[in-house]
Amino acid sequence: MASAAPEKDKSKVHKLSLKGSAKLVAEFFQYSIHTILFQRGVYPAEDFTAVKKYGLNMLVSSDDQVKAYIKKIMSQLDRWMQHGKISKLVVVVTDKDTGEHVERWQFDVQIFQTKSKSSKSSKAKSAATNQENDASAAHAATADKTEAEIQAEIAALFRQITASVTFLPQLQGDCTFNVLVYADADSEVPVEWGDSDAKEIVNGERVQLRGFSTTSHRVDTLVSYRLGD
């Protein structure tokens, strides 16, 4: 970690490196998965422990199987993020009894790079076929930010995810979850990973949530859900 600059103004011009930005986004995904599992009651509240992150009290799963699954995802996700291979990450909540997808959290990733990437195709690994990442969003959003400003944006997004319980239907019965990672078609994929359909919500409602950006990435959030019968 770089030592703090003696002049206050130095913090204003600090730019997060591409590698540092990729690590920050991957870490955000990790906490997002845990937060969704807790807030949506996919696992019992007693299966979570509190940690301090982004200036917030975050809850992370202490279930060994869940931790192992997320760790496996993150180890690969870190590598793909470092090489700019990810266009989105999706958390899908599924009814165990019916197999119906009832909730879908989508995190779209834009990489602010000048290298030509627009022609690359993507596939959802550990799940899905990809829509092209729309890199046309204004790069103006990438004005230099301090890490503190980025952390504040992330904290605001997590507060919104937490507040989503006010409009999302209560999940009925036992549910499970899957994580889909949309990676470039030329990405190296571990043998235990496989392609998947997009696991969209049939006739679902959609709500656009907040996003955040660094000088290298922008992440936008969308939740889709099935209305109760």
Describe the predicted segments one by one.
Residues 68-75:
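Eukaryotic beta-rich interaction modules
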Residues 1-61, 67, 80-229:
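Long protein-protein interaction modules used by eukaryotic assembly/scaffold proteins
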